[in-house]
């Protein structure tokens, strides 16, 4: 059954893109606004060009995703249905069913670890290709006027919609609501304020020679300081350069958050020396303030009706990682479909 009406979605990560995809399939006019230069949120991919012959491609946010059996069997089947669709379309592929650990032992995931076929961001780009998406759209204010939401961006643009979904990290959504003078029930707000995230400092290192990371190209660290190392060349997305992603653990990321990039790079390269043993041609440092959920809201999404139809969603609500973001976005879409 087709629905009339429109919906604005703030945030172009997986929660926002999945909500937008479902709502559009049900006939709503959907607009996605994202503050970044590219779509995907933590499905993030970046290129480092060293020369005409050498270019590294890095997945530097989420490294892969799985379909777990811990979130709820009905919802898992729903997510698996989407995964099957993406596999059939060739958008994603299985990377592995586990990775080696820093200790040298292999840790099985007991389930497929999926990745984007071209890159992890390519999944987000696939979803976005049929949607109306505005990037570089930093939203600064929300208002409910004449039975619709009006959203203003930092550049002065205005967007309107009958419904509104917020999918940024919870602290950012709360800040936006505060700046917009939109009040939330004190008990609900207190629960939202308890949602917390681990930070993650990530290094993108373009190496002169192949890494020593064991196949299939991922390695779990102890978290002190490295939590994860990935060889994007082995992963199959960086064919013209030996691109290595190094992700620090939460404690290191917190302690070194304000340190300069050179000091961070020195520490992470020292920790990874056994698996690199090669000259670094170029590198970048990226800081993920809201990398992974530490304490979640405990519900798939938050549905509010005042001052107008407003949904808060994202991985901070149901469960961490890509799966949690997807399931939250699907729940957000379902909650709005009865509002015809």
Residue ranges and their predicted role:
Residues 3-5, 154-163:
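Core beta-strand elements of the Rossmann-like FAD/NAD(P) dinucleotide-binding domain
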Residues 8, 21-51:
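Glycine-rich FAD pyrophosphate-binding loop
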Residues 22, 44-96:
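N-terminal FAD cofactor-binding segment of flavoenzymes
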Residues 40, 53-55, 162-216, 278:
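Central helical "cap/lid" subdomain
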Residues 67-68, 74, 100-126, 258-264:
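Short beta-strand to alpha-helix junction loop
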Residues 135-150:
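A conserved short coil-to-beta-strand element within the FAD-binding core of flavoproteins
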Residues 202-255, 267-275:
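Active-site substrate-recognition segment that forms the wall
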Residues 266-308:
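Flavin (FAD/FMN) cofactor-binding core of flavoprotein oxidoreductases
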């Amino acid at each position: 059954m087709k629905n009339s009406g429109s919906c604005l979605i703030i945030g172009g990560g997986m929660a926002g893109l999945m909500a937008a995809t479902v709502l559009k399939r049900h006939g709503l006019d959907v607009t996605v606004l994202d503050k970044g230069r590219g779509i995907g949120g933590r499905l993030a991919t970046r290129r480092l060009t060293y020369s005409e012959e050498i270019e590294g491609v890095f997945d530097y946010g989420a490294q892969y995703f799985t379909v777990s059996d811990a979130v709820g069997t009905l919802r898992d089947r729903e997510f698996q249905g989407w995964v099957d669709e993406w596999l059939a379309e060739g958008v994603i592929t299985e990377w592995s069913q586990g990775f080696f650990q820093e200790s040298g032992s292999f840790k099985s995931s007991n389930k497929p670890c999926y990745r984007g076929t071209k890159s992890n961001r390519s999944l987000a780009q696939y979803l976005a290709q049929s949607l109306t998406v505005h990037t570089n759209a930093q939203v600064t204010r929300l208002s409910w006027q004449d039975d619709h939401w009006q959203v203003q961006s930092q550049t002065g643009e205005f967007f309107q919609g009958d419904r509104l979904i917020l999918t940024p990290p919870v602290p950012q959504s709360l800040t936006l609501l505060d700046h917009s003078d939109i009040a939330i029930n004190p008990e609900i707000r207190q629960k939202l304020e308890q949602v917390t995230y681990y930070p993650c400092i990530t290094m993108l290192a373009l190496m002169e020679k192949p890494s020593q990371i064991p196949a299939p190209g991922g390695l779990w660290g102890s978290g002190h300081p490295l939590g994860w190392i990935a060889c994007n060349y082995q992963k199959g997305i960086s064919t013209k350069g030996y691109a290595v992603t190094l992700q620090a653990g939460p404690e290191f990321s917190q302690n070194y958050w304000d340190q300069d990039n050179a000091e961070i790079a020195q520490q992470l390269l020292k920790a990874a020396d056994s698996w690199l043993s090669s000259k670094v041609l170029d590198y970048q440092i990226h800081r993920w303030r809201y990398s992974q959920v530490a304490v979640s809201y405990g519900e798939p999404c938050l549905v509010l009706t005042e001052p107008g139809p407003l949904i808060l969603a994202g991985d901070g609500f149901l469960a961490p990682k890509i799966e949690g973001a997807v399931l939250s976005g699907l729940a957000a879409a379902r909650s709005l479909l009865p509002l015809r």
